[in-house]
From Swiss-Prot:
PROSITE patterns: AA_TRNA_LIGASE_I
Major location (coarse): cytoplasm
Gene Ontology cellular component list: cytoplasm
Molecular function GO labels: arginine-tRNA ligase activity; ATP binding
Cited SMART domains: Arg_tRNA_synt_N, DALR_1
Highest rank taxon of the organism: Bacteria
Residue interval(s) of motif 'HIGH' region: 133-143
Protein family according to the UniProt entry: Belongs to the class-I aminoacyl-tRNA synthetase family.
E.C. designation(s): 6.1.1.19
Name assigned to this protein: Arginine--tRNA ligase
Pfam families associated with the record: Arg_tRNA_synt_N, DALR_1, tRNA-synt_1d
NCBIfam families for the chain: argS
Keyword NAD: no
Species name: Dehalococcoides mccartyi (strain ATCC BAA-2100 / JCM 16839 / KCTC 5957 / BAV1)
Length: 556
């Protein structure tokens, strides 16, 4: 009975049973309703509350307060609940027992690094595809936000009992790759003193000049000694591989790694594109008109049909999407697929659902998360260009300036659908104003207390947590209790910003406890009990930081 989710289920079940008893007693009619509970903003209203009486008042013909009192009269305390009360205008409140709260400290110390894990997923296979930037240039902070969203959701879903694979889809086919190769070959020739023009549709950033210089340093004029078309292709392949290495390095600096780097080309060379097209054709979702091949997505409720193969015979991006999702769902047998895309892909979502359905797959198994972009600021001023290059600021530059932990926290700090400002100056402040510093300082403060206890040779292993009873102590335990619930919420909603809010609330609860309660004192028994609480706080805060992909510093 040591999980808050178990307590939550007991509360919901007790409300359901109270409704049934009230019905049997003729006090309310038979009703079907979803029962929901939440944490009140103020703990003097209890630890859980429900507005069920307010929702049932009209159907029962009773005033909400009267209905609340009727239902509460059928609910017994126990199983971690010490008090059931009613409050205007019609709430039923539930309060955790002190005994349950104190016992939770022992549970946390026992579970240690696995505290917060739940078995929501039951081993279900989930694939999360994110970043998937074109290998034609450096990644920027928009890619960084998507990267942190993806890796954090992966951490959370693993903690919730899912099997998760993280994947980067390499867009190594199509016109952008051809433009990249033509650009690099032109820059390579220029670096060797030859007259060559960068194509108008090419890549004009300084990074291409630098990449060409790197090729000259490594290969000299080797690629001038062969036919131009072969040289352009071969050099372009090397350049693209190098760009992918740079992208990978930047992501690793952000503490983002992938299980799979999946090549778009392999969909064609491996026959998956043809197989997927055969399925769509067999299901009558392929049409030929205007010398092009179309996916009849309007048959599935989309606003328009979509071209799969252009009139010149080249596949569209959507053609690759079809083959890729055939590969994900049918060949690799993922139970659920999550795509994390920038908000500029909004128009693609409905056709993706239609395509998956046309392949014979339940479209509910595909989730596309769209995230808004980031506005970079320094104090109150917009940061548009890099001071170093005069071009759009890269993700690497931001990481180098403020650190990976600050990047990850701020990228997570708002819901995906919210645009966000990232203040570089705030991210570097060593004060409570900076939420990253505030949260990590709480962990460092915890570690300093435990180090002091070690220096004093205090053995708190036999400490009795039943001695804990100060309001600040119990508030801290209440907040620690919520971690499994946060894992469940984020796994269900796919909204990892809840983690940043929770981390700040947990840090605040610890700082308040530290202010109100002297940990190491002349009272040996109370000292041991509080040291146990401090150690449990360390575990929960470190676990929260880990789920966000951040470090837990022992000193600051």
């Amino acid at each position: 009975m040591n999980s808050i989710l178990a307590i939550k289920n007991i509360v919901i079940e007790s409300l359901s049973q109270a409704m049934e008893k009230a019905r049997q007693e003729g006090q309310i009619p038979a009703l079907s309703v979803d029962i929901s509970i939440e944490h009140p903003q103020k703990t003097n209203y209890g630890d859980y509350a429900t507005s069920l009486p307010l929702r049932l008042a009209k159907a029962t013909g009773k005033r909400p307060m009267e209905l609340a009192q009727i239902l509460a009269s059928y609910i017994e305390t126990g199983s971690g609940i010490s008090k059931v009360s009613v409050a205007p205008p019609g709430f039923i409140n539930f309060t955790f027992s002190k005994e349950w709260l104190c016992s939770l400290v022992k549970t946390i110390l026992t579970e240690a690094g696995s505290y917060g894990n739940i078995n929501m997923g039951g081993g279900s296979r989930v694939q999360i595809e994110f970043v998937s930037a074109n290998p034609t240039g450096p990644i920027h902070i928009g890619h960084g936000r998507g990267a942190v969203l993806g890796s954090t959701l992966s951490n959370i879903l693993k903690a919730a009992g899912y099997y998760v694979e993280e994947e980067f889809y390499i867009n190594d086919a199509g016109s952008q790759i051809d433009a990249f190769k033509r650009t690099l070959f032109a820059r390579y020739q220029q670096a060797l003193g030859k007259d060559a023009a960068v194509p108008q549709d090419g890549y004009h950033g300084q990074y291409m000049v630098d990449l060409a210089a790197e090729m000259v340093t490594k290969y000299g004029d080797k690629y001038l000694q062969m036919p131009a078309d072969i040289a352009q292709n071969d050099l372009g392949e090397i350049g693209m591989a190098r760009m992918l290495c740079l992208i990978s390095d930047d992501l690793k600096a952000l503490k983002v790694d992938f299980d799979i780097w999946f090549s778009e080309r392999s969909l064609y060379s491996g026959g998956q594109y043809k197989t997927a097209m055969d399925i769509l054709s067999g299901n009558n979702y392929i049409a030929e008109r205007d010398n092009a091949t179309w996916f009849s997505s309007t048959l599935l409720g989309d606003s328009k049909d979509n071209v799969i193969v252009r009139s010149d015979g080249t596949p569209t991006y959507f053609a690759s999407d079809i083959a890729y999702h055939y590969n994900k769902f049918i060949e690799r047998k993922f139970d659920r697929v999550i795509n994390i895309w920038g908000a500029d892909h909004q128009g693609h979502v409905s056709r993706m659902k239609a395509m998956v359905s046309a392949l014979g797959i339940n479209p509910e198994r595909l989730t596309t998360l769209l995230f808004q972009m980031i506005t970079l600021k320094r104090g109150g001023e917009l940061v548009r260009l890099s001071k170093r290059t005069g071009e759009i600021i890269s993700l690497r530059e931001v990481i180098e300036e403020v650190g990976a932990d600050a990047c990850r926290f701020f990228f997570l700090a708002r819901s995906t659908e919210s645009q966000m400002d990232f203040d570089l100056e705030l991210a570097k402040k060593e004060s409570a104003e900076n939420p990253v510093y505030y949260v990590q300082y709480a962990h460092a403060r915890i570690c300093s207390i435990l180090h002091l206890a070690e220096e004093k040779q205090l053995d708190y292993s036999t400490g009795d947590t039943a001695l804990l009873g100060e309001e600040a102590e119990l508030e801290l335990i209440r907040k620690m209790a919520e971690l499994p619930e946060i894992v469940e919420t984020v796994s269900r909603t796919l909204e990892p910003h809840h983690l940043t809010y929770y981390a700040q609330e947990l840090a605040n609860a610890f700082h308040q406890f530290y202010k109100d309660c002297r940990v190491i004192s002349d009272n040996a028994e109370l000292t041991c009990a509080r040291l146990k609480l401090v150690d449990a706080s360390r575990i929960v805060l470190a676990r929260t930081l880990h789920l966000m992909g951040m470090t837990s510093p022992e000193s600051m």
